[in-house]
Amino acid sequence: MNGPMSRPVPVTGEDLDAELASSVEPLSALGQFNRAGILAAADIHVARALGRLGRDDDELVGLAVALAVRAPRVGHVLVDLSTIRETAVAGSEEETDPANLPWPSLGLWLERVKGSPLIAVGDDGPADRPLRLVGSRLYLDRYWQDEQDVAVDLTARSSAGAPEIDEAVLAEGLVRLYPLDSSGLQRQAATTVLHRLLTVIAGGPGTGKTTTVARVLALVAEQAVETGRPFPTVALVAPTGKAAARMAEAVHDEARRLDIREAVRGWLLSLDASTVHRLLGRRPGTATRFRYEGHNQLPYDVVVVDETSMMSLPLMARLVDAVRKDARLVLIGDQEQLASVEAGAVLGDIVGPAATTGRPPPHVYPPIGRCITVLQANYRFSGPLAELALAVRSGNGDAVMAVLDAGRSAGRNALEGDSNARWLDIDVATAQSESLEPVRSAVLTAQQLVADAAQAGDAPAALDALGRLRLLCAHREGPTGAGTWNSQAEQWLAGVGEGPPLEGGWYLGRPVIVTENDYGLGLFNGDTGVVIAEEESGLRAAFRRGAGVVSVSPARLGAVETAFAMTVHRAQGSEFDEVVVLLPRASSRVLTRELLYTAVTRARRSVVLVGTEESVRSAVDRPVARASGLTARLWG
């Protein structure tokens, strides 16, 4: 019978969390970990369900399983039972020291876990268990399999040589295409691409990682020209549509300038870029199954991945499975930036010890070391901004504060001055209007340039102006979140007659960011645009597409948000003339060294940190350490 009483009642995520939490006995060990905010009720629910299926009700095993379930949720690939007591971070509002929770002794814990029917022991243990223990590292089995697959694939590629090349052609090309490479590192990276099937090019912003792609590909193409072979097939990919578009743009811009044959130039200009998901051909209705995989591999001779730091371990596993074993794989990125929002810190794990040595001596380290080059020279910015980025990356709080103290700002002219790394020492969460006047002034000044160009219908000028300033936030919501600061910017604009006379949320000069890929419009998650006036069609949203501009009716845009401010995560892969970083309080768990470094290095010319010294030091002193076994597998 279908009637009002038979209709299902919608259950929200909060309802489900509350329901699961009510089933956790508060005085049990698991209940104490739940109250401390280390384990979510869902972690415990899954652990108990697995225990029932495996007929194992040992509470120590249940705790280990719940922590392994939790691990990917907070970015880890595994839980290391030998260190979790020191590395766990309590997440409740109660002042709970994780060290005071009822942790079992390691010896007893490992003994119980090894004896559980739920858990395979060792890399060669049974394949039919949901979890696997390797040493003290406990994995959900699929993450162990992904890590194993990536390690085996990259080790094999690093040990294999690429097809034979003409060394004389390469030598001449290196001199011609890298005339200013005083360190020799860019030439080293290019040589690796030609000689090996795996190349990793790492380094900070402005070190020439992306622009060197065109030169490397030109060298590969010149080998084909000299031997009469066709040009290689190439896939340029990145984790997001925005990063892919920037990669293609960089390759095309560089191709127009290079001293190369016209045939090679035309070939480079014909290359396009896509997201990794689109390259692999994601199957509808699933995030982990793709058209291309081990039994149906990609047809490309060279696969180049930019912004590799944003890739999760599962996605990297799918990619290496799909790339032909005789194809060249080139991974590019900054291992110090924010890692994927999902499990793993793949690029950092791969680079490993090479992060501090540039390239390890071949007689000391395994084959992976011969495939890695860490670029050092910065061509984008200098002065205090470069000093600040280096100090943050190094975790030197005193050096960070020394740079900021030299550029300390106060009063109405706080965002002016000679230093390109400045500091507005206020608590963002409670700041009053007067103390925020410097930020308000900067937003209004920058937006006036956008609005003037938008009113004139000059889309390129409006988009150029949009890249002059961006507010960056650690959070999406809350008093220091991007949502709050977008609203604040609109209020400031409304106060001077420039802001929303709102019509469905659209107004002249509104900056917007796309939040979902729209392949029909050719717009991708992370693309930014601006609303301009067009004589015949009224308001249009203008976006860059390659070297040109495309304008779209606002009615056709669904998944967009206002973008005076954005999260640091969303800003990855982008750069602006000036960024204003609005820091949360020191207690924020997302305030990390990697987040601050990523925020600071979005600036081309200058950065302003807005926040207290406590917040700055807290970020610098809180590096992200994601639990993983990939470095150990690759480097030994």
Where in the sequence are the language-model features?
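Accessory, non-ATPase domains that flank or precede helicase/AAA+ motor cores in DNA-metabolism machines
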Residues: 2-167
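Residue-level signature of catalytic and energy-coupling elements of molecular machines
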Residues: 84, 150, 240, 275, ...
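N-terminal pre-Walker A segment at the start of P-loop NTPase domains
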Residues: 167-184
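N-terminal pre-P-loop "Q-motif" helix
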Residues: 179-195
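ASCE P-loop NTPase helicase motor core
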Residues: 187-188, 196-409
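Conserved helicase motor core of P-loop NTPases
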Residues: 336, 340-512, 518-521, 532
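C-terminal accessory regions
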Residues: 394, 527-636
